[in-house]
Amino acid sequence: MDAESIRLNNENLWAWLVRLLSKNPEWLSAKLRSFLPTMDLDCSYEPSNPEVIHRQLNRLFAQGMATWKSFINDLCFELDVPLDMEIPLVSIWGPRDEFSKQLGAGEESCPGPQLYHGAKRPFQSYGSSPRRKNSKKQQLELAKKYLKLLKTSAQQWHGGVCPGAWLTPHSPQTYIPPVLQWSRATAPLDAQEGATLGDPEAADNIDVSIQDLFSFKAHKGPRVTVLLGKAGMGKTTLAYRLRWRWAQGQLDRFQALFLFEFRQLNMITQLPTLPQLLFDLYLMPESEPDAVFQYLKENAQEVLLIFDGLDEALHADSVGTDNAGSALTLFSELCHGNLLPGCWVMTTSRPGKLPSCVPTEAATVHMWGFDGLRVEKYVTCFFSDLLSQELALKEMRTNARLRGMCAIPALCTVTCFCLRRLLPGSSPGQSAALLPTITQLYLQMVETFSPSETLLDTSILGFGKVALRGLDTGKVVFSVEDISPQLMSFGAVHSLLTSFCIHTRPGHEEIGYAFVHLSLQEFFAALYLMASHTVDKDTLVEYVTLNSHWVLRTKGRLGLSDHLPAFLAGLASHTCHMFLCQLAQQDRAWVGSRQAAVIQVLRKLASRKLTGPKMIELYHCVAETQDLELARFTAQSLPSRLSFHNFPLTHADLAALANILEHRDDPIHLDFDGCPLEPHCPEALVGCGQVENLSFKSRKCGDAFAEALCRSLPTMGSLKTLGLTGSRITAQGISHLIQTLPLCSQLEEVSLHDNQLKDPEVLSLVELLPSLPKLQKLDLSRNSFSRSILLSLVKVAITCPTVRKLQVRELDLIFYLSPVTETATQQSGASDVQGKDSLKEGQSRSLQLRLQKCQLRIRDAEALVELFQKSPQLEEVNLSGNHLEDDGCRLVAEAASQLHIAQKLDLSDNGLSQTGVTYVLKAMSTCGTLEDLHISLLNNTVVLTFAQEPREQEGSCKGRAPLISFVSPVTSELSQRSRRIRLTHCGFLAKHTETLCEALRASCQTHNLDHLDLSDNSLGGKGVILLTELLPGLGPLKSLNLSRNGLSMDAVFSLVQCLSSLQWVFHLDVSLESDCIFLRGAGTSRDALEPKFQTGVQVLELSQRYTSRSFCLQECQLEPTSLTFLCATLEKSPGPLEVQLSCKSLSDDSLKILLQCLPQLPQLSLLQLRHTVLSSRSPFLLADIFNLCPRVRKVTLRSLCHAVLHFDSNEEQEGVCCGFPGCSLSQEHMETLCCALSKCNALSQLDLTDNLLGDIGLRCLLECLPQLPISGWLDLSHNNISQEGILYLLETLPSYPNIQEVSVSLSSEQIFRMCFSKKEGAGTSLRLCECSFSPEQVSKLASSLSQAQQLTELWLTKCHLDLPQLTMLLNLVNRPTGLLGLRLEEPWVDSVSLPALMEVCAQASGCLTELSISEIQRKLWLQLEFPHQEGNSDSMALRLAHCDLETEHSHLMIQLVETYARLQQLSLSQVSFNDNDGTSSKLLQNILLSSCELKSFRLTFSQVSTKSLTHLAFGLGHCHHLEELDFSNNSLREEDTELLMGALQGTCRLKKLHLSFLPLGASSLALLIQGLSRMTLLQDLCLSHNQIGDVGTQCLAAILPKLPELRKFDLSHNQIGDVGTQCLAAILPKLPELRKFNLSHNQIGHVGTQCLAAILPKLPELRKFDLSRNQIGDVGTQCLAAILPKLPELRKFDLSGNRIGPAGGVQLVKSLTHFEHLEEIKLGNNALGEPTALELAQRLPPQLRVLCLPSSHLGPEGALGLAQALEQCPHIEEVSLAENNLAGGVPRFSKRLPLLRQIDLEFCKIEDQAARHLAANLTLFPALEKLLLSGNLLGDEVAAELAQVLPQMGQLKKVNLEWNRITARGAQLLAQGLVQGSCVPVIRLWNNPILNDVAQSLQSQEPRLDFSITDQQTL
């Protein structure tokens, strides 16, 4: 019966019903909301309107008869209905009498909805009625009735249908399940972990998937399921679907199901109990709720509670009410089993951080929306007619973006809704234009609101205002007060709002309204923001933000504006322009400005560095704008590597990313780590040609994900690296990859690490290797493969030509490959040629096989050996960690000679025993390529290292022919193959010695054994003695290590005999306490037994370091008898011999015996006693050694514990050195010491530093000094000598005419040194620093200076000598004749005026001949000539006639003129002449005028005003005898320069003129040229840094012929180009005396260089030519190379920084063979390369002094060649190879270079191993002053070597080790080296890995260690 028949048959009844309800509109509205909570009603339009009531009754009637009858029943009971009308109403539509029996009868239908029937029954809350005690049967009956009521209520709510997707009614069969994916460990019991749930092709079977949601195994705890999905995925729909299924009886495991929404529960104002939540707020039992609740508790395992929208739950701190968060509290108690224990709880939520109330063991299910099949299934169900279905499906299949949007079920519904409107009247494919974005999709939906195309602008904006207000306040549920009736009607008409009843507390109900979907609320809010004139642009752009999903991990509740920025971006699209203009009723400019503002914000965001989630949201926004320029900008702003970590990504997210990548040109790397990924999302990457590296790492990636990925991989043409690690891929997923990977031939790396692959899948993947020609790595580690496939893997590695390495270790399985282009050889057609080619390929290919910890046994070894024999050359075989044991190791070792192993065979950790060791040794007898065998049973180490085949070695050396000529004979001999055997920690005893030696003899029958290591065994003294007897049978070794074998002293004496009995033993090192014993051959260091062995170029390190034998015995206690026996044993040793002894202490008797035995050791060259405590008498015993043994040339005893004696075979050599620093010597020891030393023939050096002499000891020493035949340095530093001692020395100075220099400093350095000369009368220099003198002491000083006639120079530095004291000193010093120079450095010099200084100098008793003042440096120099000669009055008057005496200093002038009359040299530096009155300049003018003998005047680095310069110029104009003038580096203006040039016109006798850094303009240059034309005697002209340029050079060149005597010409830094150079070249032949020519730092190219090259041969005297820092290039260099041999006198040339390459460099150095005098070569900062270096090494001039090649692109080979060539240059003083990549090519010197002062190897990437040889051989350079090793990779090993040699480097002043890898240990060693006697003032160590506190501690112990950059810069 339909509504139409009702109206026809009961027209009067229907009309009366309308009239009745018109009078009760509020009652009708309440009932409609109760019966129709989810439907939208016309309640906003005049509720009393009969038409509205009529329409509402029709909707109610359409719900079915059960609902309609329930409504009529409530109408009759609750309203005042007349009896005459009630009877027909009840008779037609009323309930039957048996309604009360339906529940018991079990019928499924129920009249009325679930919550609101029975309004006649008064409300009674749970707990308000008295509880009655019921029997078990009654309780069961009551529960049964309630459960049936609960089910029928659910059926009634759904009205027989299940809610489907939004906007469209659906039947139960039309529901399309989304893709579900399990997470965590709680997978369904009957489903595969990681599988997706739900089959879109079989809707009937979907119940099985839904059932799986509740079939997982819960461990002792609550059964909680969390369903996670982004907005629009269908979480709420699935929740109601579950309730519908349960109501239909399809979830039979649950008796009761309760469904709650958190958005409604948030409205509860009073904290409910669980029974109140279930009964009062959901459905109340008809009676006895206590019994029903008790039943539910007892059967909790069959109760399901669903809570929808956990992300919307309010926390206790979210609102201000006391009961806030009460619903979440109940939810938490349920989840943790505190309430209704055992029940099932399910909740839905958007992704993010779950509240703490969710148990960690809860099952998590991800909802991913629709895949392609589900989209098509949904479209098919949506459209009822076949034509519409076909059209819609066609649109979906042709529009990938539309299909991608439909992956979100909510958007799929909107899309279908829009297509239903568009398809009938549109052409195919039009959806791509009309629905390109989500925003456009929603706009199409909005346009359907008004079919007449007239938009309801006011309603839309009003709706948007409500939506925005809700977003701003966090409101999704609105009340009647929030929405106006008009808007409510608008929302109801267009299905935009949904209404429902809300229980805020028991017994209280309200009506709530909400948007049908939160995204719709965001869309209307975006419309309002873009179109409302009440929102300005600043407010608008504040909403364009990116919501980071990382925030979701820290916030308990999501924000409500996830899609708002995307909608705003979409509305900023040009396609929305007209719509917004119409909606806002504004012009295009107004709308355009707002759209542009949004685009600008997105552009700024695109330029920033964003987190992964924000980047994804930005890509969505950019896609919505449809702005190609913004998309391109965003794409180009991406980093080269995009990483996304730990947040969910959907197909839509990757589609947005792919859309951006389409606009990118450069390749990109994509890395997805720990991100939950939608199974079909890789399909979005189809065609992404910009992706070069793609990596996925997530446990949620399974087979379905792999299948989807395989559809994309073949379309990604640039993909080189693919990673699918940490996933759950099984055989099913691998089957797709196996089919796909061959289609990706460009792949270089594939990683399937940590999946679930088994043997068949692994083998299938490995078999793909030949089909991937560019693959370099395949990683299959951490999968489920077994040991049974190991041989198959090895076979593949051997047979596949591209495999170069197979690594298997426990769970690791990695293939490394070489691309085909690198390994394939050319093939020819003939079969025999093919065979040769394949042989060559097998020989060239090398393979590494690492099969570690694979449980291999001897039978496996047999199979492997068989496979190995078929393989190409094996580079490495590693079988460590297996179970081969003795027989297996022997088997593999015996086969080693046939396996062609190039490098290493590792059999470690295989259970080898001592017996097995002998097996392996004997097996090695047939292996000719064995280089090293290392066996350690304790460490389970068995490693065999092999050398290359001889033919390969020869081939590898072909390219190094130039270097071979430099290899010394010793080195060539050592470069042959060397065999090393190390048997350490093997437990060998003395009884094993013979057996061991027998095995060793067997192993070296055909190949000599070079290095033998038997350390860390238990041979003992007996075993070692026996071994020394058997050593001759092992042949000539190069080293033997017997450390840690428990040796005795007898064994040591036995080993000492080896120095004489075994010819190969050159060095014996013994440390008894630490039990270290080394026997070494010639040229072998202790490193010989290290695992790494040098080959190739590095073999040069084995060059002969020592030519003498050495014996080192440490940590022992030597008694007289032992010493006697030891010396007797050493007598038989051939020499030369070096002996080093280290004892805890050595008695005087023992020392005497040792010294007495020295004459019997004529071969002894060095004796050291290190760390040996000696007595206080030992200095006298050692001082007497020169008389006892004349061969001793040097004795040093430091701190009574370090003694060194040097011997020389030439006893006739004059001069010996003796030193006793730190030996506590005092005045009482001086006489005895001098008596012993007086027996020397000649004493060249005596070091008594750091003793206790004091002033008295100095007196004693000076008294004994005449006895000493000293002719060198006497060092008394650090002896606490004071000023009194200095004065005493000066008093006695006339008694020592052979003292040449005295240097004293009373600062913390405490320097006191005297230098004696062999000849008398050479003059004495006295240097005093920080020696403060009192006035009385100044008088004594002056008296001594007057008496010491031999004193010629006095230095006073910081001696606190003030101006009065200086005046007194100058006045008191008076001599009968001679010269005395005084150098003064005091702080007050810069603060005293020039007249004051002049006045002081005028007080001198002698005549002033030289004067030099530097104010900034605070230095004063003057030279006095005695006696003071008085001039006659006539000459005095003549000199005064030119002077300006009209000054206040006129009284001084007469005295100055007299004092300065004989002044010959005047130098003023850093002096200011800016005084206003010109006093200083006038005074200087008068001095110049009066100094008729002045020959040299220098004024440099000074401030000179124009007025002062006028005075100076006037004075200079009268200096007619001036020969030298230096006016460089002054601050002058152009007019000042002209004034100065004018003063030069009369200086025709000048020989030297320096005018650097002057502003030489055209006029001043013209004056200079005019002056130069008169200086015919000029020899030295410097005009550098003047910017003369080409024009000025042309003018200058014109007068050069007038300077025939010119010898030195400097034009550097003058911007001279090729034109100026050509002018110079034309004139230079007219300067025949030119010797030094400097054109550096100009702009000369190859053209100018060609001109120079043409005339340089015409300069026969040219000795130095500097053309550095120009641009001559290779062409110019070749021109110079052709003419350089024509310059016979050339000594120095500098071509640094000239862009010279190998072509020019090689040609240049080839010309060096013609030079006889060349001393200096500087070619740095050019790209010379190795060819130039090797060529230069063959042609270095033997007289070379300086070689500078920094930053020249040199390599190791060139550096080694140069080092060997430098050994043939005995005069070399400086070598610089800095900033070259030398690595292992550090210069290795083996010959003495006596003059070498500086070595610069900074920033050369040098490591310890390469630098140790250089450090150890620094003693070959006795004159070395600077060692620069900064910026390398040096560590503690080099520091240790340096510490050893520092005490022997007497001239070393600078050691730079900053920016290295030296630790605190290395610094401590360096400190010890300094303490032992090094004179190095500082070692720079900053920027090394040393902690600040450790550095401070070390620096406090040894101040010469510098760890501070600041301190360093001040040095």
Curated annotation (Swiss-Prot):
Segments forming domain NACHT: 223-542
Binding site for ATP: G229, K230, A231, G232, M233, G234, K235, T236
GO molecular function terms attached to this record: ATP binding; RNA polymerase II cis-regulatory region sequence-specific DNA binding
Induction: By interferon gamma. By LPS and viruses (at protein level).
Any one GO CC term of the record: centrosome
Membership in a protein family: Belongs to the NLRP family.
Subunit structure: Interacts with CHUK and IKBKB; prevents CHUK and IKBKB phosphorylation and inhibits their kinase activity. Interacts with RIGI and IFIH1; blocks the interaction of MAVS to RIGI.
UniProt-recorded name of the protein: Protein NLRC5
Organism the protein comes from: Mus musculus (Mouse)
Encoding gene, per UniProt annotation: Nlrc5
